[in-house]
Amino acid sequence: MSQTNGTHTKKAVHFGAGNIGRGFVACFLHNSGYEVVFADVTDRTCDALNNQTSYKVIEVGAEGTEEKTITNYRAINSKTKEDELLQEIATADVVTCSVGPNILKFIAPVIAKGLDMRSEELKPAAVIACENAIGATDTLAEHIKEHLPATRVEDLSTRARFANSAIDRIVPAQDPNSGLDVKLEKFYEWVVDRTPFADHEVPSIEGIHWVDNLEPYIERKLYTVNTGHATAAYHGYNRQKRTVYDALQDREIQSEVRRALENTSKLITAKHGINPEEQQAYVRKIMTRIGNPHLEDAVERVGRAPLRKLSRKERFVGPAAELAEKGEDCSALLDAAEMALRFQNVEEDAESKELAKIMAENSAEQVVSQVCGLQPSEKLYPKMVEIVHRVQQDSMDDTE
């Protein structure tokens, strides 16, 4: 770790120099006094960051726009300069990432090597995955352990502490001419599990809310923000709406979103003991946020990666399966899932093309098992089979 005038200079290595990395995570790290070292695989992004001494984070909301200037960063291409990156990880205070849940396994080997090189004199690095997925840091930790000898796994906690997090901030597609600048909503939530740091102080990072039990925050966020956002996008896409804002101006779509959030709110309040009035206030806030006209959030961007969003622990099937087991209403979630199944062959979205292929080549039962991860013994299974069959039938009718 670098020293300045005898004083320790805090350093964070962040994997993924995309919009969330630059606009959300790095912004808070910068504001907390960290030097940020971005690790990315794109030459163009790394070169731009290294050639430009600052970029802007532009927060937009009903009350106006605020700009923040980010400085004190560097970028390393993790594909071509691994040795350099290893040294940075070995001396970092914090290692974060926003690469997408499916990419965690690819960044794990270099993080494993870097952590293994850490001096015993240093405090353990705080490793926090900032992904839209439950238990993403746990997933990353398991991948890291796969690349370490058994003896080094045993004492890994002396070199790193792994904390799950829940992040919440809407970052729309950016103007192609915006360069490194990032436009996003003013609202944010970054909740991190305090318990892995039991005998150490948590890292000092502005914007983080440290908690002892993360699950209620993760599920409330995933099953309200992500469920609501995706429901609006998929219904909007199927009705030829351009943005989520446009979709929510349609009363029928707005009603579908509210119904879906009524389904999930029933689960959230019962499961986590959250006050129903508090949850309703949260829902109202979310409806305002996803309907922010200043974000220009395209339905294709919000709907992208339908295979992941239709999976077992995700925003539709996850809560719907739990509600179905309890005999509770999950009809609006099923309607949203149907719209997601119809999100096929969308330009610049590989998963939507893969979804179309899976739907065309498999039985409804196979699709429900493969895509949704449901077992025939689960109460939701026959309902999803019926929906998949209907979507497949409609596709066949369209081709005749």
Curated annotation (Swiss-Prot):
> Entry's Gene3D superfamilies?
N-(1-d-carboxylethyl)-l-norvaline Dehydrogenase, domain 2, NAD(P)-binding Rossmann-like Domain
Q: Catalyzes what?
A: D-mannitol 1-phosphate + NAD(+) = beta-D-fructose 6-phosphate + NADH + H(+)
Q: Which InterPro entries match?
A: 6-PGluconate_DH-like_C_sf, 6PGD_dom2, Mannitol_1_phos_5_DH, Mannitol_DH, Mannitol_DH_C, Mannitol_DH_N, NAD(P)-bd_dom_sf
The record's GO CC annotations read:
cytosol
Q: Write the record's keywords in alphabetical order, separated by commas.
A: NAD, Oxidoreductase
Q: Which domain of life is it from?
A: Eukaryota
Q: Any one Gene Ontology biological process term?
A: mannitol catabolic process
What SUPFAM superfamilies does the annotation carry? 6-phosphogluconate dehydrogenase C-terminal domain-like, NAD(P)-binding Rossmann-fold domains
Q: What is its EC number?
A: 1.1.1.17
Q: Name one GO molecular function term.
A: mannitol-1-phosphate 5-dehydrogenase activity
Q: How does it assemble?
A: Monomer.
HAMAP family on file: Mannitol_dehydrog (MF_00196)
NCBIfam families the UniProt entry points to:
PRK02318.2-5 (NF002652)
Give the protein family: Belongs to the mannitol dehydrogenase family.
- What is the protein's name according to its record? Mannitol-1-phosphate 5-dehydrogenase
